Structure formats: C-alpha cells, structure tokens
UniProtKB/Swiss-Prot annotation:
Residues 235-488 form the Protein kinase domain. This is Tyrosine-protein kinase Blk. The active site is at residue 354. Non-receptor tyrosine kinase involved in B-lymphocyte development, differentiation and signaling. B-cell receptor (BCR) signaling requires a tight regulation of several protein tyrosine kinases and phosphatases, and associated coreceptors. Binding of antigen to the B-cell antigen receptor (BCR) triggers signaling that ultimately leads to B-cell activation. Signaling through BLK plays an important role in transmitting signals through surface immunoglobulins and supports the pro-B to pre-B transition, as well as the signaling for growth arrest and apoptosis downstream of B-cell receptor.
C-alpha cells in the first residue's frame, strides 16, 4: 500500500444493411443525453438528410418516448438513420414505419460489438472495477473494454474472490496480424466472441471461469430541458426519506413512471427565492459525481426534484450490515469519488459549504454522489456567511467558524473530516467533545488522532494535510482525487500475467 508520485504529477494550484442475427444485451443503457442537449424537438423531416449515408442500426435497449417527437423502440428493433446530428438521431423504425428521435447511445450498427452484453467500449479501468464490484455482480462476472493505454487493443476485467475480499483482475487481450485475439499465446481465437465462449467453459488459467457479463441497473429516463418548471400534479410523493434544515425529502414518481427524490421547502426556514436560488445553482453544476437536479415546482409549497439514490446517505449506509463490511479499498474508492465531484466544483469556481457524510448519497451500485447544494454559491473568490446562517461546527474550518469566510479550502478541511467519518464507518467526529470544546481545541492546534482502522499513509499524507491551519497550504481537490485514486495501485501490477 502507498501513494504514487501524484504530488509531483498534479499541480497544487490546482453502409448498407443486410439481415443478420442480432444478439441484444441485458446490461443497462449508458446515461441518456444531457439536459443541455435537447434540440431534438425540431419537427421530424420526412426525408433523409442528403448528406447522410444510408445506415441501419439496432436498438440496444428499450426506449420509451418522453415527448410526441420521440420514437418509442424496443430492444432489438432495427431502424434506419435519417439524421445523426448531435446526441439525438432521427430514425425510422423498420418494424412500425414510424419516425422520431432516439438517443444516439441507445443504438449501434447491426454488425458491431456493442450488441454483445459483455462489451463496454469506452469504460475506464477504474469504472470497470466499480461496476464489477457492485453487489449484483458475482465471482466470474466480466466485461471487455477498450484499453486506455493501447489504442485499438482490448482488456478483459473479471471479478474474483480472494482472501482479501472481492477484487477485479485485468487481462490484456492481444491482437494477431490476421485479425485474431489471444490472452495466452498457446491458444488463439478468431473473434472476441470465441474468446469469451472458451473462457466461459473453463477458466484455463484465468482467476475465474467467466460466468455472467457485468450487469447494471436500468438507466434513468431522459429529463427534457423544457421540463424545468413542472406542475405539482405530475409528482406523486410515496415515502418520506428524511428531513433537514430546509425541508423534507421524499421518494416519489414523476408522471407515475420515473422514480425521483423530491425535496420540499419547510416554511419559515428559507425564503422561496433562496430555495429557487439553490435549485438554480444545482442546475448549473452537472457532473456524474453530483446528484442531478431535474426540475422544480415554483408555487408554494415549493418542490425540488432530483435523481433518486437507492442506498440513501453515506453516513447511514456505513452503519448498515452491508456498509460496515466494506473493505478499506472500497472506502478509499468512495472517498476518491467524492474528491472527483469536489474537484469539478473547484474547477467551476464554486463551493459546497456543507460537505459531510450525511450529504453524500449512495446508489444501488455503491457509487457516491455529492448532494445538498443548499449552501453552495457561485463565487468570485470567497463567500461570506450571512448573519445567522447555520453550519456544522465539527466539519467547519477554523477561518469559517471565526470569521464566517468560506472558500474551497474550507471545503478541503471538511473533506478531511469526511474521510475520518468514512474510515470509522460513520463515527461522530471529535467523539465526546462538545462544539465549544472542539473550537477551543482547534485554536490550540489539536487534531483528531489517527483511528486504528486508518492506514498511517492516509492519515499523515492526506487527512492532516486537509487540516492545515493556513487555508492556502491545504491541497486542491484535484490533488486529493489523484492520490486517492492511486492509493492502492503503487504496489499492484496493472495487468495479470498471461495464464
């Protein structure tokens, strides 16, 4: 275990179609096109784009039309592409003859690896590990992806069970001059499909016999850009998830078919204008590690609608039976995901101001996203807390406690406390100390000691660096993301040896 040389590497400053047999896949679709790209509302044209070559694709997944200009398709349905501009393609179904728009990442050419349920073309090594380590994937679950380091080559990633717990092992798939493939030179295959078929019958030197392709949950439905302010009757509140400083949070449904989280304003704690300001900040910040904002109801009681995260907040999850059994590498990877989201906030010249485990949400696949931007603000250089504003003392940097001045460096301090929450499986920071005692102790240079469950390298090289007294001496989130992602790779080989 240890750190790579990330400190030196990262700045502190931060065609024609013919009938074929289609094998459709069961894995979940990739994310739908972003909110900012919703130009597919232009009326469908009855004629094909003159510059568009005649092209036929197959639907990789079901797509339910959201608007009357969309084309509803079923997995395996063949389509003719009429226009392929941007993230939305105009297509005609060869089954129904209807025309409309479909997300471009929901279709693929009829003769392509994309129709194989085990093929994840552009997924990174790190995300491949995260997906394979999800609870629904068992030992032997696998995927094939394009190599990040060798363009045109492929890698096989397999979930394994060792004495250290669940791990993912990676194998290089090498190409032959005649177009074949191999992992071990003693046996070659004409296609990737043949390679998968062989290692699915027997492991033949791999860590596990290949069992099932890596699975994902169904994707979230598209949310159209023009559905920002929505009618209250389009929402159904089903189950109360909790309450906070600004209101309650419910699990519910939009238009009876899309599961969402709905945050309601608690009257008297925040003006409608401030609540809508929170929503507008969230709307401008879009990243895969940030909980996504979908819409708002602007008439009181005001609602804010976001994506639903099935496992709830990280603080509560760490205290469950499943959470308490998470290995240290999984905990550090969760920390890296939070740092990735905060690095985006840092690049966007914004701050969070309430970063703690209670405001990190966990998905069904145990991916973490940053939530609750009620206190985040777009800033020039710093945001001064308004008189009377509340903030959690045990997570707050000294300069913010004493002077009410918040910068991204105050978020870095909070991140150090968040790391302590994670490695102690949700223990309250500064156990046994009151808020005034914490303030006095920090003034005299006190810092929480290294827990027994925390590696010294993590505590000395990362956590305590976040707690530097001078804000400018604290690391950037870019740096923190880098060292946390690399924490366990310094002593690991990038690939398994040839079987």
């Amino acid at each position: 275990m240890g750190l790579l040389s990330s400190k030196r590497q990262v700045s502190e400053k931060g065609k024609g179609w013919s009938p074929v047999k289609i094998r459709t896949q069961d894995k979940a679709p990739p994310p739908l096109p972003p909110l900012v790209v919703f130009n597919h509302l232009a009326p469908p044209s009855p004629n094909q784009d003159p510059d568009e070559e005649e092209r036929f694709v197959v639907a990789l997944f079901d797509y339910a039309a959201v608007n009357d200009r969309d084309l509803q398709v079923l997995k395996g349905e063949k389509l003719q592409v009429l226009r392929s501009t941007g993230d939305w393609w105009l297509a005609r179904s060869l089954v129904t003859g209807r025309e409309g728009y479909v997300p471009s990442n929901f279709v693929a050419p009829v003769e392509t690896l994309e129709v194989e349920k085990w093929f994840f073309r552009t997924i990174s090594r790190k995300d491949a590990e995260r997906q394979l380590l999800a609870p629904m994937n068992k030992a032997g679950s696998f995927l094939i992806r394009e190599s990040e380091s060798n363009k045109g080559a492929f890698s096989l990633s397999v979930k394994d069970i060792t004495t250290q717990g669940e791990v993912v092992k990676h194998y290089k798939i090498r190409s032959l001059d005649n177009g074949g493939y191999y992992i071990s030179p003693r046996i070659t295959f004409p296609t990737l499909q043949a390679l998968v078929q062989h290692y699915s019958k027997k492991g033949d030197g791999l860590c596990q016999k290949l069992t099932l392709p890596c699975v994902n949950l169904a994707p979230k439905n598209l949310w159209a850009q023009d559905e920002w302010e929505i009618p209250r009757q389009s929402l159904k509140l089903v189950r109360k998830l909790g309450s906070g400083q600004f209101g309650e949070v419910w699990m519910g449904y939009y238009k009876n078919n899309m599961k969402v989280a709905i945050k309601t304003l608690k009257e008297g704690t925040m003006s409608p204008e401030a609540f809508l300001g929170e929503a507008n900040v969230m709307k401008t910040l879009q990243h895969e590690r940030l909980v996504r904002l979908y819409a708002v109801v602007t008439r009181e009681p005001i609602y804010i609608v976001t994506e639903y995260m099935a496992r709830g907040c990280l603080l509560d999850f760490l205290k469950t039976d499943e959470g308490s059994r998470l290995s240290l590498p999984r905990l550090i990877d969760m920390s890296a995901q939070v740092a990735e989201g905060m690095a985006y906030i840092e690049r966007m010249n914004s701050i969070h101001r309430d970063l703690r485990a209670a405001n990190i949400l966990v998905s069904e696949t145990l991916c973490c996203k940053i939530a609750d931007f009620g206190l985040a603000r777009i800033i020039d250089s710093e945001y001064t807390a308004q008189e009377g504003a509340k903030f959690p003392i045990k997570w707050t940097a000294p300069e913010a406690i004493h002077f009410g001045v918040f910068t991204i460096k105050a978020d870095v301090w909070s991140f150090g406390v968040l790391l302590m929450e994670i490695v102690t499986y949700g223990r309250v920071p500064y156990p046994g100390m009151s808020n005034p005692e914490v303030i006095r102790s920090l003034e005299h240079g006190y810092r929480m000691p290294c827990p027994e469950t925390c590696p010294p390298e993590l505590y000395n090289d990362i956590i305590t660096e976040c707690w530097r007294g001078r804000p400018e001496e604290r690391p950037t989130f870019e740096f923190l993301q880098s060292v946390l992602e690399d924490f366990y790779t310094a002593t690991e080989g990038q690939y398994e040896l040839q079987p």
